[in-house]
Amino acid sequence: MRTLIDFSVLQEYNEKVLPRGDKLSALSSLVDWNAFLPIEHKLYKNKSERGGRPNISIIIMIKHLILQQLYGLSDPQLELQVADRFSFRVFLGTTEVIPDYSTVWLFRERLKENGMLEFIWEEFVNQLKAKGYD
């Protein structure tokens, strides 16, 4: 749930950062993130009647991996930087609780096990190439 502080910080970000150029926001607008949604059913099988904690959005998790690759961050450093940098939060599209580093690691491992990690990078790169970026 967004708070008044979230809106205030976002307003300041929009007024002071975006006019000077935010490469992550520009990158985010180039990608059709919905193209990644079909792999979700291959990764998660919510068959338990007991429920449990809901999965974090697959798009948010993929964006974590992209940030990690772009900035050369370890899993613990990624967690710290996402907590610290508002531009990362804007790129992720959330001010909600962020996954800890072990969740990012487990997500990447799950992608590897299902052969989806390569698909994600190919899709990401192909979309950027289609927009004229190499």
Where does each model-flagged region fall?
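Short, flexible active-site-proximal loops enriched in glycine and acidic residues
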Residues: 73-81, 88-101, 133
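Short, conserved catalytic/metal-binding motifs centered on acidic residues
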Residues: 22, 40, 64, 78, ...
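Charged, often Cys/His-bearing segments associated with DNA-binding zinc-finger transcription factors
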Residues: 1-35
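Basic, short loop/linker segments at the boundary and entry of helix-turn-helix/winged-helix-like folds
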Residues: 24-66, 70
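Active-site- or DNA-interface-adjacent structural scaffold in DNA-acting proteins
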Residues: 95-134
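Generic recognition of stable, solvent-exposed alpha-helical segments in well-folded globular domains
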Residues: 19-22, 31, 35, 73, ...
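Short amphipathic alpha-helical surface patches that mediate protein-protein
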Residues: 41, 45, 83-84, 109, ...
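Non-catalytic DNA-binding core/recognition domains of DNA-processing enzymes
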Residues: 60, 81-84
